[in-house]
């Protein structure tokens, strides 16, 4: 980590009603003594897409290069970005069995954000008394609920 640049702690989460189904994502960003909450939704998505989107949107909101710690309760996101992505890039976004990587569109966007920051990815057990994770979970649930309400209006 570079001691001369700002440190930001981010908690992310995704939620989906059905898989696929209406989903939401949320992130809590903490910098010094301030925090910012962001959330969003998609009407037809998966839980994994919402997990990736939460991290992507949290990184996109940062205006300058930062030292970042991202906490996620998604092993898919944490392992994907720290372990699997290197081979995906090398294999032109294909897995070792030559199948296309699922959610490659989002993984590619997230991968592009990596060069802008120094990032440490940490897995945290979901629903286990971690206040940042609980906050991100609530934000993702709000996003999911918004998607559900919009779909109700369309019926």
From Swiss-Prot:
Mg(2+) 1 binds at residues 13, 51, 73. Residues 4-145 form the RNase H type-1 domain. SUPFAM superfamilies: Ribonuclease H-like. Its EC number is 3.1.26.4. This is Ribonuclease H. The lineage of its organism: Bacteria, Pseudomonadati, Pseudomonadota, Alphaproteobacteria, Rickettsiales. One of its GO terms (cellular component) is cytoplasm. InterPro entries: RNase_H, RNaseH-like_sf, RNaseH_domain, RNaseH_sf, RNaseHI. Coiled coil: none annotated. Its main location: cytoplasm. Monomer. Mg(2+) 2 binds at residues 13, 137. PROSITE patterns: RNASE_H_1. Its cofactor is Mg(2+). It is an enzyme of class 3 (hydrolase). It catalyses: Endonucleolytic cleavage to 5'-phosphomonoester. The keyword Nuclease applies. One of its GO terms (biological process) is DNA replication, removal of RNA primer.
